[in-house]
Amino acid sequence: MNLFTIDTTSREVMYQPDIPAYGHWGLAAVNAAIFALFAFSFFKPKTRRDWRSFGAFSSFLVALFAEMYGFPLTIYLLSGWLESRYPSVNWLSHDSGHLLEMLLGWRGNPHFGPFHIASFVLIGGGFILIARGWDVLYAAQQRHELATAGIYARLRHPQYLGFILVMTGFLVQWPTLLTLAMYPVLVIMYLRLAKEEEREAVHEFGSRYLDYQASVPGFIPWRRR
């Protein structure tokens, strides 16, 4: 891991020699598996809809870590522009994959940059929502009741929001063309899954769910319907 400084006048990044950080497919697989299992331990998918949600999230992780440690497709496709704009950068170093820090002029190790720190907050917050949502949802399912306690008293879909926050965090930390393309598709998918879930809840709980739906926001805590 190397440090760099950025001349804000010339916009060139000065690097120490670095070893190419790609081609590590085993490391990519291990990281994708660790985060997928971490999410699985919190989410615990049971229904077909749960597995669709978890599968989409897992595919995002695979695409992300394949570029982070395997093959830098985004940097390869943008190499002409990147090399002409930042000729002093070793774009095959791991640090260079933190594109937001690189392009916006962060002066220091990108792992301590503002976007990297923000990504940890988003990822951590997302996993907390997924975990807290599961605790309440599982207890309600065991009693065949509507989940309205805990985090569900503030949000109707905390777990879907959690997945979106985790994906947002990874996108901020390590943006790639593939994950940028996948992100809006997956967000729309989660919104549709939430609507599908609500139709089933209305069918099962009737006016109780309609009252809950009218008083508790779906994804944004301070927004009311």
Stretches with model-predicted labels:
Residues 145-152:
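Intracellular coupling helices
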Residues 154-161:
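Histidine-centered phosphotransfer motif of kinases
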Residues 1-145, 166-200, 204-207, 211-225:
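Membrane-anchoring alpha-helices and their flanking helix-loop junctions
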